[in-house]
């Protein structure tokens, strides 16, 4: 068969076999096979050859093979098939895929400076400075809740990883000193408000047998040392019920008698807490003196009646706001009633009140503890029990646990002012202060006892009291040790 006399353009052949010399169109592979019979081939893109071009005959292909390979004898014994074509292409492709690409290097881990506040390991930059998770959360809560803290020393406490929980006042001041920004907290809060609310937590919480037993023991200890409002026969008095006076001595005598009985009940409650009597005597005294006023205020506020704006004591005596002021609460009165109103929406039951009282008492950040780590270990199951109990009781309110726990901060703020009030009362009453009130309340969280002649500025009389000095000053007669 003769080919056309017109010249046919030969496209450049590109592909995997470029190391072979270029062959006339349409050969794509080395023309090493003589006498092969090919079906008509189309163009590179599946189209027939342009007009004027014809497909070469087997004879011309054979001649081209002769010229290109120099008459290779391999072509005489090999038949060209589509499967051979596919095999060659597959082999070429696979050879390229086997070449591994070098792995990209991992970015180096980001390293932050230690926490500017306590020197603990930093988790990143928070509110303008490098800070750990603990200091970040403490600063955020303090700003969002407008917390007011009190330092019981010289307002120059050392803040580090170990001591950061011992003085909230100095910790907050150091947060400001290192550059933490109030505005960053507010902006962060506003940003979160705009975000869509997340789905309610549906996680279930189950109480272990040990925690259930612990919860039951604390509930009984609370109920048997503090009768509920419905168990009391309420009675009132008309003494100074209409206007405030500096001090009603009749009400003060009654109140001091009831307060002494309440303190004895709190000591009994503490001794019934699992693990409390296993602490050193000095630590038991330190914890009781630090938390006694906290628990007193919490207990009296759970007996608040908002309709009459009254509070009821353990013998049933019911006083209104004015009478509470005149009985000795003085400037502390409105703070206590405000706190009582804040407790109402929480709807705490006896179990929650008992657990919260136990957490107030067994707290490892109190000053002058001999074994703070042991106290912290004792507090951990109390926190877990309270969390699980609250979430089981209120499954649709997952944020109730932190709300209730934050009340400890409010209690500490009020009781710090209460300790100062006990000191000033000594100068207002004609006789001596009942010894148990003076011992347990006046010295709470480091306040030294004062005499009228050494009153002066209260802030000047707040060094810490060590357990050894407490024992040497007659605390060995405390009901705790009886």
Curated annotation (Swiss-Prot):
Q: How does it assemble?
A: Homodimer. Heterodimer; with a RXR molecule. Binds DNA preferentially as a RAR/RXR heterodimer. Heterodimerizes (via NR LBD) with RXRA. Interacts weakly with NCOR2.
Q: Where is this region: Disordered?
A: 443-482
Sorted alphabetically, the keyword list is: Cytoplasm, DNA-binding, Metal-binding, Nucleus, Phosphoprotein, Receptor, Transcription, Transcription regulation, Zinc, Zinc-finger
- Hey, which family's this protein in? Belongs to the nuclear hormone receptor family. NR1 subfamily.
Q: Look up the DNA-binding region in the UniProt entry and give its residue ranges.
A: 115-180
Tell me what organism the protein belongs to.
Answer: Mus musculus (Mouse)
Question: Which named protein is this?
Answer: Retinoic acid receptor beta
> GO terms for biological process?
apoptotic process; bone development; cell population proliferation; embryonic digestive tract development; embryonic eye morphogenesis; embryonic hindlimb morphogenesis; glandular epithelial cell development; growth plate cartilage development
Q: What does this protein do?
A: Receptor for retinoic acid. Retinoic acid receptors bind as heterodimers to their target response elements in response to their ligands, all-trans or 9-cis retinoic acid, and regulate gene expression in various biological processes. The RAR/RXR heterodimers bind to the retinoic acid response elements (RARE) composed of tandem 5'-AGGTCA-3' sites known as DR1-DR5. In the absence of ligand, acts mainly as an activator of gene expression due to weak binding to corepressors. The RXRA/RARB heterodimer can act as a repressor on the DR1 element and as an activator on the DR5 element.
Compositional bias per record (Low complexity), positions renumbered to this chain? 462-482
Q: Which PROSITE patterns match?
A: NR_LBD (PS51843), NUCLEAR_REC_DBD_1 (PS00031), NUCLEAR_REC_DBD_2 (PS51030)
């Amino acid at each position: 068969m003769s080919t056309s006399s017109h010249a046919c353009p030969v496209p450049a052949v590109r592909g995997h076999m470029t190391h072979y010399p270029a062959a006339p169109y349409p050969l794509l592979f080395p023309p090493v096979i003589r006498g092969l019979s090919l079906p008509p081939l189309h163009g590179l893109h599946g189209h027939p050859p342009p007009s004027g071009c014809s497909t070469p005959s087997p004879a011309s292909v054979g001649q081209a093979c002769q010229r290109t390979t120099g008459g290779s004898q391999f072509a005489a014994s090999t038949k060209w098939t589509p499967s051979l074509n596919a095999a060659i292409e597959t082999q070429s492709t696979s050879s390229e895929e086997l070449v591994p690409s070098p792995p990209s290097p991992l970015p180096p881990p980001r390293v932050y400076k230690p926490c500017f506040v306590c020197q603990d390991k930093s988790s990143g930059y928070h509110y303008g400075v490098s800070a750990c998770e603990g200091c970040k959360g403490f600063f955020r809560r303090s700003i969002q809740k407008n917390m007011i803290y009190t330092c019981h020393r010289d307002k120059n406490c050392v803040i580090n990883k170990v001591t950061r929980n011992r003085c909230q006042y100095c910790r907050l001041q150091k947060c400001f000193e290192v550059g933490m920004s109030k505005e960053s907290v507010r902006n962060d809060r506003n940003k979160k408000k705009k975000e869509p609310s997340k789905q309610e937590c549906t996680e279930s919480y189950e109480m272990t047998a040990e925690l259930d037993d612990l919860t039951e023991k604390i509930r009984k200890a609370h109920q048997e040392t503090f009768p509920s409002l419905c168990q009391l026969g309420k009675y009132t008095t008309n003494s100074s019920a209409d206007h405030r006076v500096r001090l009603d001595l009749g009400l003060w005598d009654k109140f001091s008698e009831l307060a002494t009985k309440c303190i004895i009940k709190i000591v009994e409650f503490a001794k019934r807490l699992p693990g409390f009597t296993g602490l050193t005597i000095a630590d038991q005294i330190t914890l009781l003196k630090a938390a006694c006023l906290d628990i007193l205020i919490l207990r009296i506020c759970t007996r608040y009646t908002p309709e009459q704006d009254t509070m009821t004591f353990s013998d049933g005596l019911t006083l209104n706001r004015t009478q509470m002021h005149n009985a000795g609460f003085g400037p502390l009165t409105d703070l206590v009633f405000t706190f009582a109103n804040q407790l109402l929406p929480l709807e705490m039951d006896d179990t929650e009140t008992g657990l919260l009282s136990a957490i107030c008492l067994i707290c490892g950040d109190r000053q002058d503890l001999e074994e703070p780590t042991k106290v912290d270990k004792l507090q951990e199951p109390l926190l877990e029990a309270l969390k699980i109990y609250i979430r089981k009781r209120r499954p649709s309110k997952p944020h109730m646990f932190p709300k209730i726990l934050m009340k400890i901060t409010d209690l500490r703020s009020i009781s710090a002012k209460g300790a100062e009030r006990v000191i000033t009362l000594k100068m207002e009453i004609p006789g001596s202060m009942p010894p148990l009130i003076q011992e347990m309340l006046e010295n709470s969280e480091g306040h030294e006892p004062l005499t009228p002649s050494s009153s002066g500025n209260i802030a000047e009389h707040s060094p810490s009291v060590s357990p050894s000095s407490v024992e040497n000053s007659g605390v060995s007669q405390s009901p705790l040790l009886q």
